[in-house]
A protein has these predicted regions:
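Short, conserved, GDST-rich strand-edge loop motifs in beta-rich repeat architectures
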Residues: 84-97
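C-terminal partner/receptor-binding element of secreted or periplasmic proteins
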Residues: 109-145
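Surface-exposed loop/turn elements that mediate protein-protein interactions on large endomembrane-trafficking
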Residues: 45-63, 94-119
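Sec-dependent bacterial lipoprotein signal peptides
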Residues: 1-23
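N-terminal export/targeting and maturation segments
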Residues: 23-72, 82
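Intrinsically disordered, low-complexity segments
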Residues: 14, 28, 58, 88-91
């Protein structure tokens, strides 16, 4: 009888763990950036940069989804963004990244002014215009966590 109770307990724990790993929101996160900005991930492809209002609230996007890489210095936040496209395998409007729709963004931290979307050539030109150091290199968001 004791073994039966332990077995039931273990089964319930296992089922609970499986249910929790399937719950939306467990993989969501935010990463703080300079100037009260954050990278905010609300789902696999909804990753954006927004101003941080409080510990759990953010303002409207300043760099839209899907942000895949970022870098920053004392004056600027740089970002690489992929546009989204409807998933051809889904009929419910689910969107996936479009690797052919690449944009770059520069956010001036002090003023909040945003430059973008930019193609790669214009991005490099703006970096040079703003005298952003070549040591400020875009990094994948997954590597920053």
């Amino acid at each position: 009888m004791f073994n039966k109770h332990i077995f039931r307990y273990l089964v319930m724990v296992f089922i609970s763990l499986i249910m929790l790993t399937g719950c939306a929101g467990l993989a969501d996160y935010s990463l703080d950036l300079p100037g009260n900005y954050s990278i905010v991930r609300t789902s696999a492809h909804q990753v954006k940069v927004a101003p941080k209002i409080s510990e759990s609230h953010w303002g409207s996007d300043v760099i839209p989804t899907k942000v895949t890489e970022v870098a920053w210095d004392d004056n600027y936040i740089l970002a690489k963004q992929l546009g989204l496209v409807n998933d051809p395998k889904s009929s419910n409007g689910y969107q996936i990244p479009n690797n052919d729709d690449v944009h770059f963004w520069i956010l001036e931290i002090k003023s909040g002014e945003v430059f973008g979307p930019l193609d790669e050539v214009n991005f490099v030109e703006k970096k040079n215009e703003f005298d952003i150091s070549e040591s400020v290199i875009l990094k994948k968001i997954e590597d920053l966590k």
